[in-house]
């Protein structure tokens, strides 16, 4: 399998976002459970097509909610998924640290070595492809890194507020003055 760089991957996705003639991907989401835990296997599966139309249904109290996915359930699904990613409500694992607007990925060997952030990236791209807003609250330095793929561009966006540890942030602010 050919490995693309980020520019080729984005160009591929955005030249043909959602392919309306492709078979639908069906998702049934329980409102009582973590959304990440319910869809993780889908995103790990290479046959899961991000560009296929989605048909999302929600379960409440073990009963399917009535309705047709004309866009509302899909938007709600991505809203809840991005909320779970920001809160880190996946088996108690905190995926991002810091405050809103300055969130940075957690430094966790298991998350990095298992390529979990690659799956998180697929979830975010999937959200964009379906005209949803993606993951809000990331540090501008992290966004710069995602876009450029190089650490050099991060420095111009890096600020003390990007340090997730409040004690260390306070010390850095004292040194800065």
Go through each PLM region and give its residues.
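Long, Ser/Thr/Pro/Gly-rich and/or acidic low-complexity regions in intracellular
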Residues: 1-177
């Amino acid at each position: 399998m050919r490995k693309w760089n980020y520019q080729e991957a984005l160009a591929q996705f955005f030249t043909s976002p959602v392919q309306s003639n492709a078979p639908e991907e069906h998702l049934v989401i329980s409102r009582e459970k973590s959304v990440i835990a319910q869809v993780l296997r889908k995103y790990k599966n290479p046959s899961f097509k991000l560009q296929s139309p989605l048909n999302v249904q929600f379960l409440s109290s073990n009963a399917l909610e009535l309705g047709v996915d004309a866009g509302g359930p899909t938007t709600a699904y991505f809203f809840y998924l991005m909320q779970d990613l920001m809160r880190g409500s996946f088996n108690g694992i905190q995926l991002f640290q810091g405050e809103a607007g300055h969130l940075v990925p957690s430094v966790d060997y298991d998350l990095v070595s298992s390529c979990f952030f690659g799956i998180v990236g697929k979830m975010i791209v999937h959200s964009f492809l379906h005209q949803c807003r993606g993951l809000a609250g990331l540090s501008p330095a992290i966004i710069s890194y995602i876009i450029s793929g190089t650490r050099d561009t991060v420095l111009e966006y890096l600020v003390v507020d990007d340090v997730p540890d409040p004690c260390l942030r306070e010390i850095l602010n004292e040194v800065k003055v």
